[in-house]
Each structure stands twice: as structure tokens, then as C-alpha cells.
Amino acid sequence: MSKDLEVAGRYANALFQVAQDKDLVDVFSEELTELKAALNANKDFVKLLENPTFTTEQKKNLASAVFEKINPTLRDFIYLLIDRSREDYLSVIADVYQKRVNDLNGVADADVYSVVPLSEQELTALSRVFAAKMNKTKLNIQNHIDKSLLGGVKVVIGTRIYDDSLKTKLKDMERQIKA
């Protein structure tokens, strides 16, 4: 694990603990998702927030103006990050926090690769089958198009890969023939 991810993980875990204590886990999850989307959409704001020539107070005033509608506890957390010069971790913290929420709710993220876009019915069926395999209640599936698979699907959930693509089957046959 990289040092940055480790640091972000500590902050995310602390925020998650506070959210659980205050029964705000879902509120923080929604607000962090919106906050991350806003940061990704506005790179100039991120540059200002991470600018070392700005004082801590100037950064807090900027954050206060932009994040005025978020939960006060979450806003205080952002101020804490600014105080400790960790504002550049905010996006990663949001990701780690969401992973903790997903773990709590029995949800996992899955990337499904296919040659053509899968229908809602196919995605639902894949979600049901692989959620059961992973002991999860639900999978958030992201469908990616990969023409090199030739056919079939490849499902990636965390570090696990389930590859039922024609490309892999052909490679397996090639290895068997050469052996």
C-alpha cells in the first residue's frame, strides 16, 4: 500500500467512525460523492486549494464559501485536512470512505468487460450470480466494452478476476495444443 493511500485511509477511517457515532454514514457518503464530483469537474478550484502560497485561513475561507451547504461536521473535517496540509487527499479519502460504506452495506464494485454493451437484464443476472459468489448483497457494475475479448465476459471484483471470454478460451486451447 502506498504511503498516500495509507494516510488517506487513516483519515477516511476516522471520518467513518465519526459518521457512525453520529448516525451520518449515508449523509457523509452522499456529500463526499458530490464533493468528489465537484473537485473532478473544477480543477482550478483544486489548484487554488492546494496552492502553497495561500494561507491556511485563506484556504478555509475558500472551502467555506464553496462547501457552505455540506454537513458542519464534514466541513470541520475538511478544515482539519487544510490545517494539516492534507487537502490534496480529499478525493482519495472520499474513495476509501465509500469503500467502507460499501463494505458495511454488503456492496462491492465490479467491472464487467464485454464485446458489446450488456442489457439491464444481463447486468442484473451477473450482479445476482456474482454477489452470491462474493457473499455480498449487491454489486455496482460498470460495463466496459473490450472488442479484444472476441466474445463472452470478464468480471473483475476487487482482486478477483472471472474470465469467461473467448480470447482466454482460445489462449488456453493454444497452450494445450503446444503442450
Swiss-Prot record:
GO terms for cellular component: plasma membrane; proton-transporting ATP synthase complex. InterPro entries: ATP_synth_OSCP/delta_N_sf, ATPase_OSCP/dsu. GO terms for molecular function: proton-transporting ATP synthase activity, rotational mechanism. It comes from the Bacteria. It holds the Pfam family OSCP. It is a peripheral membrane protein. It is found in: Cell membrane. The keyword Ion transport applies. Disulfide bonds: none annotated. The keyword Transport applies. Keywords: ATP synthesis, Cell membrane, CF(1), Hydrogen ion transport, Ion transport, Membrane, Transport. F(1)F(0) ATP synthase produces ATP from ADP in the presence of a proton or sodium gradient. F-type ATPases consist of two structural domains, F(1) containing the extramembraneous catalytic core and F(0) containing the membrane proton channel, linked together by a central stalk and a peripheral stalk. During catalysis, ATP synthesis in the catalytic domain of F(1) is coupled via a rotary mechanism of the central stalk subunits to proton translocation. Belongs to the ATPase delta chain family. F-type ATPases have 2 components, F(1) - the catalytic core - and F(0) - the membrane proton channel. F(1) has five subunits: alpha(3), beta(3), gamma(1), delta(1), epsilon(1). F(0) has three main subunits: a(1), b(2) and c(10-14). The alpha and beta chains form an alternating ring which encloses part of the gamma chain. F(1) is attached to F(0) by a central stalk formed by the gamma and epsilon chains, while a peripheral stalk is formed by the delta and b chains. HAMAP family: ATP_synth_delta_bact. This is ATP synthase subunit delta. It comes from Listeria monocytogenes serotype 4a (strain HCC23).
